UniProtKB/Swiss-Prot annotation:
One of its GO terms (biological process) is ubiquinone biosynthetic process. Gene3D superfamilies: 1.20.1260.10. Fe cation 1 binds at E54, E84, H87, E168. One of its GO terms (cellular component) is plasma membrane. It is found in: Cell membrane. It comes from the Bacteria. It is a peripheral membrane protein. Its cofactor is Fe cation. Its main location: membrane. This is 3-demethoxyubiquinol 3-hydroxylase. Its EC number is 1.14.99.60.
């Protein structure tokens, strides 16, 4: 029951409250930059997609922590969720600075990620960890692509994305070391297809 209450609290905080980071944003010490209208529009779209990714991460980790009966794994999942909360706060701060807003479909993204996390976790802890590994690897690849697309002048956004990518790679490595099972190719393909729908939609809405 305590875990379910924690998950419900996380959902409410993720979707309806302004997230509080435990660590200052990597962009905090950087000066404001003067971007053109087109540059600002592109940065806003990419950071909105990144914010959606962090909303999904909260749903995924919370679902998995609700199901596992392994205290150490639950602790590790909740620790990863706290780090993802930093990312959530940083991307929201950057969206505010760019004069933009999060995706209007965040409740849908969170619910979908939570449902997928529940399904993966009910198979086994190892399968759940395998899902984490694949998710974090795909997110890392998306972030690398965003680093190539973000305007060179947008140093604050680039600093945030660079730090996020390094954190996601570490999360994948930790899940792998904890005994993750590799996902079958069809599952990886479905995840990529779902991510494509999400990123394309969040880019605009």
């Amino acid at each position: 029951m305590d875990t379910l209450l924690i998950a419900a609290d996380s959902a409410l905080r993720t979707l309806f409250a302004r997230p509080r980071a435990g660590e200052p944003s990597p962009a905090r010490s950087l000066p404001a930059v003067d971007l053109s209208v087109e540059q600002r529009r592109l940065s806003s779209a990419l950071m909105r997609v990144n914010h959606v990714g962090e909303v999904c991460a909260q749903g995924l980790y919370m679902a998995q922590s609700c199901v596992t009966r392994d205290p150490q794994l639950r602790s590790d999942l909740l620790a990863a969720a706290r780090e993802e909360t930093d990312h959530l706060a940083w991307t929201r701060e950057r969206l505010d600075a760019l004069g933009s807003r999060p995706s209007l479909l965040n409740p849908l993204w969170f619910a979908g990620a939570f449902a997928i996390g529940l399904v993966a976790a009910r198979v086994s802890d190892q399968a759940s960890l395998g899902f984490v590994v694949e998710t974090e690897r795909q997110v890392s690849a998306h972030l690398q692509g965003h680093l190539r697309r973000l305007p060179e002048a947008d140093l604050p956004s680039r600093a945030i994305v660079d730090r996020m990518q390094r954190d996601e790679e570490r999360h994948a490595a930790q899940a792998q070391a904890a005994g993750a099972l590799p996902l079958p190719p069809p599952a990886r393909w479905l995840m990529k297809a779902a991510a494509k729908v999400m990123t394309t939609t969040a880019h605009h809405i």
